[in-house]
Amino acid sequence: MELIFEKSKKGRKGYKLPELDVEEVNIKEYLPEEYLREELDFPEVSELDVVRHYTNLSHLNYAVDTTMVPLGSCTMKYNPRINEELVNKKEFLNVHPLTPEEYIQPLLKLVYELKELLKELGGFAEVSLQPAAGAHGELLGLLLIHAYHQDRGNKEKKVVLIPDSAHGTNPASAAICGFDIKVVKSDKKGELDFEDFIKKLDERVAALMITNPNTLGIFERKIKEIAEELHKRDALLYMDGANFNALVGRFKPGEWGVDVMHFNLHKTFSTPHGGGGPGAGPVGVSERLKPYLPVPQIEYDGKKYYLNWNIEKSVGKILAFHGHFLVWLKALAYILTYGKDIKKVSEYAVLNARYLKHLLKGVFKDPYPESPCMHEFVLSATNLTKYGVRASDVAKRILDYGFYAPTMYFPLIVREALMIEPTETENPDTLKKFALILRKIVKEAKEKPEILKKAPHRTPVRRIKEAEANRNLILKFKDIKE
């Protein structure tokens, strides 16, 4: 398929500007030449060319609208279209973030309602909606932990414990906040090794970051005991909320002793992934961390809703304005639509994952056969390496059959990992079809491994030389032509 640049023809236009209704000036008379911008080298195409080009491109995409996207730890569920219609109403789109509070009381009410619902669902004392994404929420959570220890004079607490199965953002966020990292091993059941945790839990530990269910899709059964041991030493428990889709409506992390957790609205509450944003990663906290929340907090005094800037020990502001309002609205609509039945989200997410894992029994190696999965599971393709086939080959071959691939090679503690999360929005027929395709691919691996090693065969872009592509980045169309 041609690139949009290859469709360009000099002089072809897709727009017409209105006639100038003010006096024309020569900008060169007012600005020195070094400040003048050069004309951008945009492709010259008609409007119809653009519409056809991007419509055709969209038909080549793998997306939730066209197929199942079983990316583990991503929760690629269906995003209700009515929510998009809702947030595109001019009453929401045209509100400036500096509009005085008295003119936006209904909107502040909606935001306050979302905050209260997240507090209830998470079992927390308070929630900040401000973070712009999950990793941003992580950063805020660690800033709150840092502020807590500084306030209490715990200058020695500079270590954050992180499981070896953790998301990569966990150690990155902790390091950005100035903490040292110590890794805690997983045990043979795929849970945090409690003995190793206790051994590394000394007076220097500020917090433990844990995901529950963890990235293996396994529930951390000792979560309450972990919280108790941390609190005995005035250390805190951070829970990564990436996998909250397995818990929502059934469990409240705050009741386990979790001190801080970020919610991924794009996962659990169906605000869309991708497109570079905007996202939202609200953070729920226990009473311990409530005094340090960022400003402003949205409050209600019984008569009006307002932005509270008067939080004495606040870590300050972490976003230019107040947060991503339209994303909040989508999450609020999603929660209100389910109401008290929101627990069905987690029930069906877990049911679908367990059913799909059952359908794939014996197809790949199960690294933790004794542990039931929650909303996702990890299998290992090490049983195919003797045929010269790796997990990445399996993933690329899946594309030929119309499904997107699972997450590969994560978590790092499982060799040749395939991390699969079907979400609650897929039906049993889709799961059966996906399982049949994987069985067929494994049969191909054993009988005709070259098919997998050269896959994909039916996608617009075939197999790329990944190592070469990483070393020799081509980021511009002109570089391709040269």
Swiss-Prot record:
A Gene Ontology CC term for this entry? cytosol
Keyword set includes Oxidoreductase: yes
Q: What EC identifiers does the entry list? A: 1.4.4.2
One matching Pfam family is Aminotran_5
Q: What are its cofactors?
A: pyridoxal 5'-phosphate
Q: Which of UniProt's keywords are assigned here? A: Oxidoreductase, Pyridoxal phosphate
InterPro entries reported for this sequence: Aminotrans_V_dom, GcvPB, GDC-P_C, GDC_P, PyrdxlP-dep_Trfase, PyrdxlP-dep_Trfase_major, PyrdxlP-dep_Trfase_small
CDD domains hit by this protein: GDC-P
Catalysis: reaction(s)? N(6)-[(R)-lipoyl]-L-lysyl-[glycine-cleavage complex H protein] + glycine + H(+) = N(6)-[(R)-S(8)-aminomethyldihydrolipoyl]-L-lysyl-[glycine-cleavage complex H protein] + CO2
N6-(pyridoxal phosphate)lysine is found on: K267
Single Gene Ontology MF annotation: glycine binding
**What is annotated about its quaternary structure and interactions?**
The glycine cleavage system is composed of four proteins: P, T, L and H. In this organism, the P 'protein' is a heterodimer of two subunits.
Its job: The glycine cleavage system catalyzes the degradation of glycine. The P protein binds the alpha-amino group of glycine through its pyridoxal phosphate cofactor; CO(2) is released and the remaining methylamine moiety is then transferred to the lipoamide cofactor of the H protein.
Q: What NCBIfam families has UniProt attached to this entry? A: PRK04366.1 (NF003346)
Protein's name in the database = Probable glycine dehydrogenase (decarboxylating) subunit 2
Q: Which organism is it from?
A: Aquifex aeolicus (strain VF5)
